[in-house]
A protein has these predicted regions:
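Hydrophobic, glycine- and aromatic-enriched re-entrant/interface helices and adjoining loop segments
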Residues: 120-137, 216-311, 331-335
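Alpha-helical transmembrane segments of multi-pass membrane proteins, especially transporters
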Residues: 168-173, 196, 217, 247, ...
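Membrane-helix boundary/helix-loop-helix interface segments in multi-pass membrane proteins
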Residues: 2-37, 41-42, 48-187, 354-369, ...
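Hydrophobic alpha-helical transmembrane segments
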Residues: 74-79, 303-323
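Loop-to-helix entry and N-terminal half of a specific, functionally important transmembrane alpha helix
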Residues: 327-365, 371
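Alpha-helical transmembrane segments of polytopic integral membrane proteins
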Residues: 47, 83, 149, 153, ...
Length: 401
């Protein structure tokens, strides 16, 4: 590097620091009201539906029908408090935490797959959780998701035209996604891996990666996915093979591997157009597995019917669209990418959960944001909404005239 190039790079870094300080010290406006209202609405509806869906299971497990609801409500309060606190903090501060988040995520992902680890929790033939069972537990993949979003947004926003190069625009991001994907597949956690890969890919695309590389990447991922499905169907890959077979026709083994999906379809169909009424689901009485977790949307369809389910999907759609509107109007590139990453992940997770319970894609462990039982997941979702609200507070005011 020549002296002139060094001086130019030094001057550019100084300008970036000045810009960041300016944004940090800038007077903040109010939070985006439509986004805030939609977030609160989904949180409240989610708690109501969780109370209804979880009552029989909670009574069967603990003797207290409100057990799961009370725990979720407590985490909702904590999460909402966190959302408002994060919404008040300037989102630029997350830049400094991006590398620390990646390091923490990798450490936790390695920790969860260590054999005979007393802190690792196994359920449904997958070891995805850390903590003390029945007291406190969380999925390291949730931390990994946030780490990828913040790190990608931070580094991509600084590179700009360098995103067109292999060395700086492709290799470091693909390498990180590859490491995280391998660690998550060892749990195994296929759905979480797909979500993180897709979110990372979208951020790279928005960040300026070349179109032909995107097409090649999508083609490669599609080929690998198709190969996995074919190998699972043939029985070569044991993990997921039964799920894929039952996805084609759950009635082939109704009392075995096809039971969960078959019950989900029965639950959805039982609701009809208007539903059986809030709290009146019959399938939640231990017929439908995971009725308060991954398959809670089936209970929503049964109790509220097609119309109620469509209203909830509309609220999700409005929240996601409003989030992307905030991204389009963000003050800077980092804020825009941060919101795009958060909303992309939310959109994909919501779509995949509904697709799973409806039988459009093979059954896999993926929760419905704001609805499924899981305190730490809900807290992190609300904190992410707080990050979006923080970006919305610094949207430049429209010029008069």
């Amino acid at each position: 590097m020549t002296r002139a190039e060094y001086q130019a790079q030094k001057a550019m870094k100084a300008r970036m620091r000045q810009t960041e300080q300016k944004h940090t010290q800038a007077a903040k406006g109010s939070m985006d009201l439509p986004f805030l209202i939609l977030t609160l609405l989904l949180t409240v509806i989610g708690l109501i539906m969780l109370f209804s869906a979880s009552f029989p299971r909670a009574y069967y497990d603990t003797g207290d029908g409100t057990y799961y609801f009370k725990r979720q409500a407590l985490f909702a309060v904590i999460g909402l408090a966190g959302m408002f606190v994060v919404g008040k903090i300037n989102y630029q501060r997350w830049r400094g935490a991006s590398r620390m988040l990646v390091g923490l995520a990798l450490f936790l992902l390695i920790l969860v797959i260590i054999p005979h680890n007393p802190l690792a929790i196994t359920a449904n033939n997958a070891t995805r959780w850390l903590g003390i069972k029945g007291v406190f537990q969380f999925q390291p993949s949730e931390i990994a998701k946030l780490a990828v979003i913040v790190y990608f947004s931070d580094t991509i926003s600084k590179k700009k035209e360098k995103m067109l190069t292999w060395r700086q625009g492709i290799v470091p991001y693909v390498a990180l996604l590859g490491i995280i994907s391998v660690l998550m597949m060892l749990e195994p956690h296929l759905s979480g891996t797909v979500l993180i890969l897709c979110t990372g890919a979208v951020l790279m695309i928005v960040g300026g990666i070349q179109g032909w590389l995107v097409a090649a990447g999508i083609g490669g991922v599609g080929t690998i996915g198709l190969l996995f499905v074919k190998l699972a169907e043939s029985g070569v890959i044991k993990y997921g093979s039964a799920r894929i077979a039952m996805w084609h026709d759950p009635w082939l083994d109704y009392s075995g591997d096809g039971y969960q999906l078959a019950q989900s379809l029965i639950t959805i169909g039982s609701g009809g157009l208007l539903g059986v009424g809030l709290g009146r689901s019959r399938q939640k009485f231990l017929y439908l597995p995971e009725q308060y977790n991954d398959f809670i949307f089936s209970v929503v369809c049964e109790e509220l019917g097609l119309i109620g389910a469509c209203v909830i999907m509309l609220i999700f759609a409005l929240l996601i669209l409003r989030g992307f509107w905030i991204a389009l109007h963000a003050r800077d590139r980092f804020g825009a990418l941060l919101v795009v990453g958060i909303m992309t992940h939310l959109a994909l997770q919501t779509f995949l959960n509904i697709a799973v319970v409806s039988g459009f894609v093979p059954t896999t462990g993926i929760s419905l944001p704001f609805f499924s039982y899981g305190g730490t997941a809900l807290c992190l979702q609300l904190v992410e909404m707080g990050m979006v609200l923080s970006v919305s507070r610094q949207i430049p005011a429209p010029k008069a005239g």
